[in-house]
């Protein structure tokens, strides 16, 4: 990972499943990811809170917004305030998607928290054809960023092949969300500022 990071000037986001993984990420990565299944792994959250690296905290599959924010508090209570929230879909009764991307959580979080929130339309749907429309929607409702699966040849991907975009699809997605961002950012920021004043 360190070689790739240096060769291509990339930032590395890596998921920690156990506390010792954080030691490795601190040496070779740039951001610690806490996945949905570990959102309430409190010892892992506390260890991430003692790190100097930013932490990307994915929402648990059945977590309320309050539970998600309280998980972030575990990290911040240890001194690490560099927490990024990631909406990645919740479990519902829907069978046409892998998960249900809760886009309403984005403006809700922006209203009650200072933390940045990004959207993962890849895991939020599990289907590549839905990623771009939901990425556009995520940016439109005020997401601070996106997490998108991309692979040169999705059919050969070792994981998450069904939800991965090709590089050309990703390039088109970026064009589209940048246009939406230009229009919606002033509105989203105004909403966040109004909340802070109120």
Regions found by a protein language model. Give the residues of each.
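Glycine-rich phosphate-binding active-site loops on the catalytic face of alpha/beta enzymes
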Residues: 36-40, 138-163
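Active-site/ligand-binding-proximal alpha/beta "capping" segment
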Residues: 76-141
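Hydrophobic faces of well-ordered beta-strands that scaffold small-molecule active sites
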Residues: 12-15, 30-34, 55-59, 83-87, ...
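Alpha-helix-loop-beta-strand connector modules within alpha/beta enzyme cores
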Residues: 1-12, 47-54, 103-118, 163-187
């Amino acid at each position: 990972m360190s070689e790739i990071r240096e060769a291509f000037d990339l930032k590395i986001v890596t998921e920690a499943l156990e506390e010792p993984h954080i030691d490795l990420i601190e040496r070779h990565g740039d951001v610690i990811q806490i996945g949905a299944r570990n959102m309430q792994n409190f010892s892992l959250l506390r260890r991430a809170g003692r790190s100097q690296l930013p932490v990307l905290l994915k929402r648990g599959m059945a977590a309320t917004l309050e539970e998600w924010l309280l998980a972030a508090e575990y990290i911040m209570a240890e001194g690490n305030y560099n927490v990024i929230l990631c909406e990645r879909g919740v479990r519902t009764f829907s069978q046409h998607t892998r998960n249900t991307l809760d886009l309403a959580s984005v403006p809700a979080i922006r209203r009650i928290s200072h933390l940045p929130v990004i959207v993962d339309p890849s895991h939020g749907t599990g289907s590549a054809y839905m990623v771009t429309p939901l990425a556009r929607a995520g940016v439109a409702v005020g997401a601070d960023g996106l997490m998108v699966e991309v692979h040169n040849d999705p059919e050969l991907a070792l994981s998450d092949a069904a939800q991965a975009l090709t590089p050309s699809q990703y390039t088109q997605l970026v064009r589209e969300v940048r246009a939406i961002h230009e229009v919606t950012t002033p509105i989203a920021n105004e909403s966040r500022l109004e909340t802070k004043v109120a």
